[in-house]
Amino acid sequence: MSMQDPIADMLTRIRNGQAANKAAVTMPSSKLKVAIANVLKEEGFIEDFKVEGDTKPELELTLKYFQGKAVVESIQRVSRPGLRIYKRKDELPKVMAGLGIAVVSTSKGVMTDRAARQAGLGGEIICYVA
């Protein structure tokens, strides 16, 4: 049986890995997952990521902790295969009054809600991270 929502699986692996105090989590890789991992790294929610393997690439995320606590308090899927959520630039949400981020897939690539607002772009809201 094939996986229905690989992005939700990625977010669940991050959530479960931090709940179990794992140093890193691995998952099958895709271009979208790498783009999301890049946004999470730039925003300081994960330590690092790397892609290994040629025939079946694996994405390894190094999780980040601060004083023994997980940096990611909550990570939540918004747009899903059964119900896509699109927002215009003026409708982009502010997560936790600007303390968290919304990961947005735009025509110019995957970016945070702040970067999309600055670029004047709307798009699909992939997830909220706080």
UniProtKB/Swiss-Prot annotation:
GO terms for molecular function: rRNA binding; structural constituent of ribosome. GO terms for cellular component: cytoplasm; cytosol; cytosolic small ribosomal subunit. The keyword Ribosomal protein applies. SUPFAM superfamilies: Ribosomal protein S8 (SSF56047). The keyword Ribosomal protein applies. GO terms for biological process: cytoplasmic translation; regulation of mRNA stability; regulation of translation; ribosomal small subunit assembly. Keywords: Repressor, Ribonucleoprotein, Ribosomal protein, RNA-binding, rRNA-binding, Translation regulation. Signal peptide: none annotated. Pfam families: Ribosomal_S8. Belongs to the universal ribosomal protein uS8 family. NCBIfam families: PRK00136.1. One of the primary rRNA binding proteins, it binds directly to 16S rRNA central domain where it helps coordinate assembly of the platform of the 30S subunit. Protein S8 is a translational repressor protein, it controls the translation of the spc operon by binding to its mRNA. Part of the 30S ribosomal subunit. Contacts proteins S5 and S12. This is Small ribosomal subunit protein uS8.
